[in-house]
């Protein structure tokens, strides 16, 4: 929806090739505009004045997303302005909007290298500004934090990533970047959200997802406690940069999905939604986390769930694992395993290598 809340943009794909047609609807008049933008990505971003949209387009032969255009509402697609084109087919392009709603980020990425450009939402036809030129084995992303930009970066062999502060002048020299949260061998940083006075970090510690809060006022970094030994979580529905709280999803092998709200100032945690599961009583089940030795003597974490009172030595077990593409196998709620548990099975999830459960090295090794 446009910033003035008058227009809605949406994408249609009728071929299955993920080449979308963007259409624009006037919400007050309840009718479609004549604008039709074909063979593009569906994630368009509005300019601040609601007069332009910025979108990505794929190469017609390779289908690699490699072009960024600006479209003026009410004009033909042939008049759209090309503002960036990537010539290296190893890189893919995608768009993102800053949490402050001031910038559009253009990300150019491949597996081990990235580059970010800034576009001012107040001036979508203006010049792009490079954050930091791409280099081999350097992955970074940025977020606006008001007075500064903040970057997640693996610069200088920080495989588990660190958080760095960037002055809004001179950030094209990485020597000017200031380390805020140092790289830790025990913590793999996956995501961050900037707020007016805080940064919320989603990390992994010993293979388990955690949330940490960095307070600008005293430079403290504190972890939020969770109720279960193993679980799954994720940051959700946090669009307001000036908010005093954030929301996150949570579930475990014995806790049905829920959404919680965490107050950044008084450090309170409240459940605001929970999925009701018929005939499921969480206190009937037990969850544990163990580690087992692989053939090369590496400890592999395994989460298990079973019904209380079960004879574990003689019970059958169903074990699940997937290790590829850095995909994590977290211990979230699975209603499909309840019948097995009630019949005396143990269910286990192994966090095998190939995922990034234990950090970047877990994937690379």
Set out the residue ranges of the language-model regions.
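Conserved beta-propeller blade repeats
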Residues: 1-11, 38-56, 88-107, 134-153, ...
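Cap/lid segment of the alpha/beta-hydrolase catalytic domain
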Residues: 11-19, 28-33, 227, 262-268, ...
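A flexible loop/linker signature enriched in serine peptidases of the S9 family
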Residues: 12-21, 36-40, 56-67, 76, ...
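Multi-bladed beta-propeller domains
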Residues: 15-17, 24-42, 58, 71-92, ...
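Conserved blade-register residue in beta-propeller folds
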Residues: 24, 70, 118, 165, ...
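Structured, non-catalytic alpha/beta "coupling" segments that mediate domain-domain communication
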Residues: 148-155, 160-161, 241-272
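C-terminal substrate/ligand-recognition segments
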Residues: 154-156, 188-206, 292-301, 340, ...
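C-terminal structured "cap/appendage" subdomains that terminate the fold
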Residues: 193-260
